[in-house]
Amino acid sequence: KNKGKVDGRLEGDHGGSAGILRSGKVSTWEGGQRVPAVFWAPGRIRPNTTCKTMASTLDILPTFTTLAGAKTPKDRDLDGEDISRLLAGRFDEARMEKVYYYYLRTTLQAVRQGKWKLHLPRPAKRPWLAPFAKNKHIHPKDDAAFGEPLLYDLEGDVSETTNVAQANPKVVKQLLAIAE
């Protein structure tokens, strides 16, 4: 605000800490994927509300198109979805069960559905990391190879500290089938 008026800018502040989330950028752990977003539209978005439903930057174009009262183009497919209902404070349960795919470059590394996130096995040699090899912000533990899928309950363990794959073999099987 400037003297009580908004000057028309859209600003973002992307700090260097992922807080309690595991790892950081250049990873498919939650610390590398989650980015907070702040939206402000008086009369359309209630102040001081929080939405924990997943969304993507791909959703920005269709959402802003709706908020502007325009129509999305019909001659092409848009990758994102209109999330204006979420911004208006209306929960979308169906969106919580959508499948989200976590890629690093061109390699599928994890799949999420609902509260479950499955990290797919990773080999010791990972060609997708070559461009980032000198990145000192990647923790060795988060870059380690593993031969079995790792399953996390993100509702109870957003920091991805406890692998619950052995206790939930049906969930692992279901998410592996989705990944294939």
Q: Where would I find each of the regions flagged by the language model?
A:
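Short intrinsically disordered, low-complexity coil segments enriched in acidic
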Residues: 1-8, 160, 180
